[in-house]
Swiss-Prot record:
One of its GO terms (molecular function) is 3-isopropylmalate dehydratase activity. Heterodimer of LeuC and LeuD. Keywords: Amino-acid biosynthesis, Branched-chain amino acid biosynthesis, Leucine biosynthesis, Lyase. The keyword Transport does not apply. This is 3-isopropylmalate dehydratase small subunit. Pathway: Amino-acid biosynthesis; L-leucine biosynthesis; L-leucine from 3-methyl-2-oxobutanoate: step 2/4. SUPFAM superfamilies: LeuD/IlvD-like. The keyword Lyase applies. Its EC number is 4.2.1.33. One of its GO terms (biological process) is L-leucine biosynthetic process. It is an enzyme of class 4 (lyase). It catalyses: (2R,3S)-3-isopropylmalate = (2S)-2-isopropylmalate. It comes from Bifidobacterium longum subsp. infantis (strain ATCC 15697 / DSM 20088 / JCM 1222 / NCTC 11817 / S12). Belongs to the LeuD family. LeuD type 1 subfamily.
Length: 229
């Protein structure tokens, strides 16, 4: 996963509260079997409106920092919501509050969910709307957002901050314990040699396997009448 320490990019003001995951990416797009390529599905219903913020030339395909209202990412649990934001280009989402599951999914996928007071978000909206296409700088090192001459602090979980700054996804974290895992597997194989094994399909068990009905059985009545069930 790509490291995130400091990001300078176009800030996008999204003056909407209680944005749920179905608004971020409709369920119809969840049928895809890949983890990427969801940028076209981000805010799909809203982007059909020509006046939606991401359809404005100052923001279309350029946004990297999204500034939204409280309770962002509520609704059903779908990691696709974070994938869609990331695929579009957003590495940071700023809001007064986030849904817990969505917040957890951001860190796993290289997106920072930065928590700011409502008054700070309102100020950022004002600054971004006064100068569409304006760039902002987000620093995980100092936990601050700078927009023009204004610098504001944000909150981020220490563990989330550590993961993002080091670019650790779940696989990276697991591989840090590779030696411990190998040692445990070795110990388990030696101490518990009777662990169950799956029989390969080409080998048949020695005992005969009886079926409920033999191939030459012509019984057509209910199985219950034969005492089988």
């Amino acid at each position: 996963m790509e490291k995130l320490t400091t990001l300078t990019g176009v800030g996008v003001p999204l003056r909407r509260s209680n944005v749920d995951t179905d608004q971020i990416i409709p369920a119809v797009f969840l049928k895809r079997v890949t983890k990427s390529g969801f940028d076209d599905a981000l805010f799909y219903a809203w982007r059909r409106d020509p006046n939606f913020v991401l359809n404005k030339p100052e923001y279309a395909g350029k946004g990297q920092i999204l500034v939204a209202g409280p309770e962002f990412g509520i609704g059903s649990s779908r990691e696709h919501a974070v994938w869609a934001l990331h695929d579009y280009g957003f590495r940071v989402v700023i809001a007064p509050s986030f849904a817990d599951i969505f917040y957890g999914n951001t860190a796993k996928n290289g997106v920072l969910a930065a928590i700011m007071p409502q008054e700070s978000v309102e100020l950022l909206w004002k600054l971004l709307e006064e100068e569409p296409g304006r760039e902002m700088t987000v620093s995980l090192e100092t936990r601050t957002v700078t927009c023009g001459d204004v610098t504001l602090p944000f909150e981020v979980n220490d563990y989330v901050r550590w993961r993002l700054m080091n670019g650790y996804d779940d696989i990276d974290l697991t591989l840090q314990h590779e030696d411990d895992i190998a040692a445990y597997e070795k110990m388990r194989a030696e101490k518990f040699p009777f662990k169950p094994k799956t029989i390969p399909a080409k080998h048949w068990p020695e005992e005969k396997i009886e079926s409920a009905r033999e191939p030459d059985d012509d019984w057509t009545g209910p199985l219950a009448d034969r005492g089988i069930i």
